[in-house]
A protein has these predicted regions:
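Mixed-charge, low-complexity intrinsically disordered regions
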Residues: 1-67, 73-140
Length: 140
């Protein structure tokens, strides 16, 4: 077994076009941050990422394509996410409002609501978000 196979998986969005775009942005170096709902970690009983932790990025075909290392983790109110974080997500957003609109659409999707087990889930200014900065260590 290769060392890469022992690393935890870093999955961005759900398999499909969005994941493909996010993985491409990671591989190009454009994406150096991400965000997730704190409630998602809690419902899955998963620990938050930790600084120095490495993970294998998986693509839509479930292949490990890169290794990233966490460099910062913050838990913030959705209203407190800053412009630098939004820009560093590498999705082309030019403002926090644009970033938030895109993320609200994703977080209100049927897939996220199903994953959370809450068909009526919505976010607001006080929703807690885990923001994570990472660096690309290498591609596979």
């Amino acid at each position: 077994m290769d060392v890469i196979d022992e690393l935890p998986r870093a999955e961005f969005a759900f398999p499909g076009p969005l994941r493909d775009r996010l993985v491409a942005a990671i591989l190009s170096g454009a994406k150096t941050s991400t965000s997730a709902l704190l409630v998602g970690y809690e419902r899955a009983n998963e620990p938050l990422p930790e600084v120095g932790e490495r993970a294998a990025v998986v693509d839509s075909e479930d292949r490990r394509v890169a290794v990233i290392e966490t460099t910062e983790v913050r838990v913030l109110r959705l209203a407190d996410v800053d412009l630098q974080h939004a820009l560093d997500e590498g999705e082309g957003d030019e403002s926090v409002a644009q970033w938030r609109a895109g993320h609200e659409t994703f977080w209100h999707s049927a897939e996220v609501r199903a994953e959370l087990g809450d068909p009526g889930f919505t976010v607001d200014d006080d929703t807690l978000v885990v923001t994570e900065r990472f660096q690309l260590v290498h591609t596979i």
